Each structure stands twice: as structure tokens, then as C-alpha cells.
Design a protein with these regions (language model features):
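Glycine-rich, N-terminal phosphate-binding loop and its surrounding beta-alpha-beta segment
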Residues: 63-122, 126
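A structural-propensity feature for long, helix-poor, extended segments
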Residues: 69-88, 181-184, 191-202, 215-216, ...
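Glycine-rich, mobile lid/loop segments that gate access to catalytic sites or pores
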Residues: 131-241
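Glycine-rich anion/phosphate-binding loop at the beta-strand->alpha-helix junction
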Residues: 33, 39, 219-222, 226-336
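Short acidic, glycine/tyrosine-flanked loop/strand segments centered on an H-E-D-like triad
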Residues: 117-142, 325-346
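N-terminal, positively charged regions that mediate nucleic acid binding
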Residues: 20-77
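Alpha-helical support elements that line or immediately flank enzyme active sites
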Residues: 39-51, 147-168, 243, 247-251, ...
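Short, Lys/Arg-enriched N-terminal segments with co-localized hydrophobic residues
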Residues: 3-18
């Protein structure tokens, strides 16, 4: 057989040296844009129906929950993260046209990143961005920065208004930080917003704080996990086979920076389960509706919502902290051994889960 030959068009199919992939969705479609140290970040939302009551305060209350500088355990970068709605809203209601939203960057401190301009940081996108595109914005990670999620949060605020009208509720909280896990028996929704980690277990939150204090003292950080519960989801959302609800949820969540794993229902625990304990048995409620006695499947069967609560779990990796005696590489590929630490790189976070 002859050897395959690839023409210049193969670069298009393999991704080329342009950055595509900033748009997600079908009916309700979002495109996030901007870099950590650019003029601003934002999102364009396409597919929002006309007539939805919407103002900047509706968006701002969501952004205020993720903005930096609210806790000693998150990045100290000070940003107001004030949203500006540029289009798609008139006299307090959506017009059905694309909604563009902007958040201006204010506290970039780009000079803090000048030392790492020619280095690849472990655990960051520095290396792959440079190898793929031949050029990268090293200031705060550029497009791979956590500030990319501002656009997602702003779009999510609109989505939540639509879902609220449909009676669909979403609850998200931190399940674990390091080895400290919220006890389901101590679940208290009222304490989620009362601790800096959004944990539903007050005792676990206290222990998480002590654990992160120790991490910070050692110039280290921690990973964690987040759980999400979607309630009142109607039956029948999702299509086999490549448009499964589970697959689309996974794509959306795994595209968030620092997310390394995604689970639905019992998730990875099913690898250790037996069939007779894992299968959700059916019964009927007093109205004759078919319901499940358990929910190991997490509310999705065959990629289609079954009407029960949808349970999601996300694993988040720790941030880069001090890496004593670690090996770094310069852009020209010379290996460099740092006996004490890599070059300092701006703002740091002890644990990402809160945001």
C-alpha cells in the first residue's frame, strides 16, 4: 500500500493554527471571548427568546458569586466584574436577537507574568498552546485563564431565568476539598452560602478551611469536587446517540479549565457495583406515574432525561503552586532546573472549587 500524503487542507481538519471552539450549543448558543489580560472578556448569547425580562442586575448577582478577591483562599486579583449588556435587550426585555455582554478587566498586573514569558509552567496550557499555534499570550494564561468562565456565568444567568420559568431548579455546591468530604447525613442547604467554600456541611467547611491554611503555609494548593443537582427536569430531553443529554453535559463541563473528570449518578462507583444493587427498580406513585425507587443512573437513561433529579459530579485539579526542584522548559526547549521555585506568575488560588 502507498503512503498516505496530506495536503495543506489537513491542517483545517486537524485544527490548524487558528483557535476555533469558543462556541457551544444548538438552540441556545453561546460564544465566549476575551483574554485574562486583554481589555475585557465576554459572551454572545444567541437563541434567547424575545420578551424575557432581563437587566444587568440579573447577570451581576451571578458574577458576584464567582468574582475574585472575596476569600483568602481564592485569587487576590481585585476585579469589580461589572457586566455591560451591549445588545439584545430593549426597555428591560430581550428582543430575540443576539445578546452581547462585556466585563472589562481592571487588575491585570501583566508585569507579574513577564518572568514566565519564555517558560512552560507545569499543569498549564503554555506548552500545548505554543506547540499548536506557534504563539501564545502568556499573561495570566490568555484564553486558558479562569476568567473565560465569566462569559459562561453571564450566559448561565440568562439560561437560569429561562429554566426558572419552566420550573427547573439547579443547586450546585462543593462536595469535597482534598480528602475532606461533605457528609450527606449533615447536608444543610442553608449553610452553602455561609462559608467560603460553598459546602453544605458546616463541619466539613471548617475542616476544609484548616486544611487549606496548611496548604497555603506550605505554598501548596488542593483539588476538590463539585456536585450539581437539577430538579424538575422534564422527561425526554436528549437524543441518541451522539446528542445524548449526558454527552452534551459532559462536553460543556469538561471544557471548563481545570476540570479533569465528570460523573453522572453513581459515576465511577459503578465499576465496583453489582447489577442487582446498581439497577434502578421501578414502581408507581399514587397517581399511577412510573418512578424509580433509586437513582443510581443520576436521572438519565439511554442519554435521555427520565424525569428524576439529575446528579452531576465534577473533579477539579489544584492550581500550580511552588514547585521546588521541578523541571521547567524554556520556549527554545532548553531544560532548566529550579532549585527553589519557578518564576512567580501573578495571582494564585488555594482551591478553585468555590469559583
Amino acid at each position: 500500500m502507498g503512503q498516505l500524503s496530506f495536503g495543506p487542507d489537513i491542517l483545517f481538519y486537524l485544527g490548524g493554527n487558528f483557535m476555533a471552539g469558543s462556541t457551544f450549543g444548538t438552540l441556545f448558543k453561546i460564544t465566549t471571548w476575551g483574554e485574562s489580560h486583554g481589555a475585557g472578556v465576554g459572551v454572545v448569547v444567541d437563541g434567547c427568546p424575545a420578551g424575557l425580562s432581563l437587566c444587568e442586575d440579573d447577570i451581576q448577582k451571578f458574577l458576584n458569586r464567582r468574582k475574585p478577591g472575596q476569600s483568602r483562599y481564592t485569587t487576590p486579583r481585585k476585579e469589580d466584574d461589572a457586566v455591560e449588556i451591549l445588545s439584545g435587550v430593549f426597555e428591560g426585555k430581550t428582543t430575540g436577537t443576539p445578546i452581547s455582554m462585556l466585563v472589562r478587566n481592571q487588575n491585570q498586573r501583566s508585569k507579574d507574568y513577564s518572568e514566565i514569558a519564555s517558560y512552560y509552567r507545569p499543569g498549564h496550557a503554555d506548552l500545548t498552546f505554543d506547540l499548536k499555534y506557534g504563539f501564545r499570550d502568556y499573561r495570566g494564561g490568555g484564553r486558558s485563564s479562569g476568567r473565560e468562565t465569566i462569559g459562561r456565568v453571564a450566559a448561565g444567568a440568562i439560561a437560569c431565568k429561562i429554566l426558572d420559568q419552566l420550573g427547573i431548579k439547579i443547586l450546585t455546591y462543593t462536595k469535597s476539598i482534598g480528602d475532606i468530604t461533605a457528609d450527606p447525613a449533615c447536608f444543610d442547604r442553608s449553610v452553602i452560602m455561609e462559608n467560603p467554600f460553598y459546602m453544605p456541611d458546616a463541619d466539613a467547611a471548617k475542616k476544609a478551611g484548616e486544611f487549606l491554611e496548611e496548604c497555603m503555609k506550605n505554598e501548596d494548593s488542593s483539588g476538590g469536587s463539585i456536585e450539581c443537582v437539577i430538579q424538575n427536569m422534564p422527561v425526554g430531553i436528549g437524543e441518541p446517540v451522539f446528542e445524548k443529554l449526558s454527552a452534551n453535559l459532559g462536553k460543556a463541563i469538561l471544557s471548563i479549565g481545570a476540570v479533569k473528570a465528570f460523573e453522572i449518578g453513581d459515576g465511577t462507583a459503578v465499576a465496583h457495583a453489582l447489577g442487582h444493587t446498581n439497577n434502578d427498580q421501578y414502581t408507581r406513585d399514587p397517581d399511577g406515574k412510573i418512578i424509580k425507587l433509586t437513582n443510581h443512573s443520576g436521572g438519565i437513561l439511554g442519554g435521555i432525561s427520565d424525569g428524576s433529579d439529575i446528579f452531576l459530579r465534577v473533579s477539579v485539579k489544584p492550581t500550580l503552586r511552588s514547585q521546588e526542584n521541578s523541571h521547567h522548559y524554556k520556549r527554545r526547549r532548553q531544560q532548566t532546573d529550579f532549585c527553589k521555585r519557578p518564576p512567580r506568575s501573578g495571582h494564585r488560588t488555594a482551591c478553585r472549587c468555590r469559583r
